[in-house]
């Protein structure tokens, strides 16, 4: 499979992506990681208004192969949860970078996107040369 690694995303070691939008941060899971999971059957996410610390679990993604936790790459408050992926996990599987985002976070701390991998760094980590 050919994966997309858009330049506008930053990636955590645990395969979550971050997209900055108007001072807020959209969080999701990379195409590569979703593909590795296989058929997704269930998604559970924290509630809107939840305050999370860097590295804290914000949900689980269950597939026919495994159950994986997802982690927040920085501290912040959940201001939006994508209910669509909870109601229909296929959205996450079919479009993880688009309609399959998971949370929108407001962060009061200085979010250092430079601490996360850029698309080339992430691609070299997950796709053999």
UniProtKB/Swiss-Prot annotation:
Keyword tRNA processing part of the UniProt annotation: no
Superkingdom to which the source organism belongs: Bacteria
Cofactor: (R)-lipoate
Cofactor note (record): Binds 1 lipoyl cofactor covalently.
Gene Ontology cellular component terms for the protein in this record: cytosol; glycine cleavage complex
PANTHER family: GLYCINE CLEAVAGE SYSTEM H PROTEIN, GLYCINE CLEAVAGE SYSTEM H PROTEIN-RELATED
Subunit structure: The glycine cleavage system is composed of four proteins: P, T, L and H.
Protein name: Glycine cleavage system H protein
Species classification: Bacteria, Bacillati, Cyanobacteriota, Cyanophyceae, Synechococcales
This protein's encoding gene: gcvH
């Amino acid at each position: 499979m050919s994966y997309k690694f858009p330049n506008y995303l930053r990636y955590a070691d645990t395969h979550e992506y971050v997209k900055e939008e108007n001072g807020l941060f959209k969080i999701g899971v990379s195409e590569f990681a979703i593909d590795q999971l296989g058929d997704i059957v269930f998604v559970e996410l924290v509630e809107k208004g939840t305050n999370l610390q860097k590295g804290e679990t914000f949900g689980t993604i269950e597939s026919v192969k495994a159950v994986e936790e997802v982690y927040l790459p920085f501290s912040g408050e959940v201001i939006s949860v994508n209910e669509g992926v909870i109601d229909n996990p296929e959205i996450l599987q079919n479009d993880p970078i688009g309609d399959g985002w998971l949370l929108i976070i407001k962060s009061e701390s200085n979010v250092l996107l430079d601490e996360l991998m850029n698309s080339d760094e992430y691609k070299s980590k997950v796709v053999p040369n």
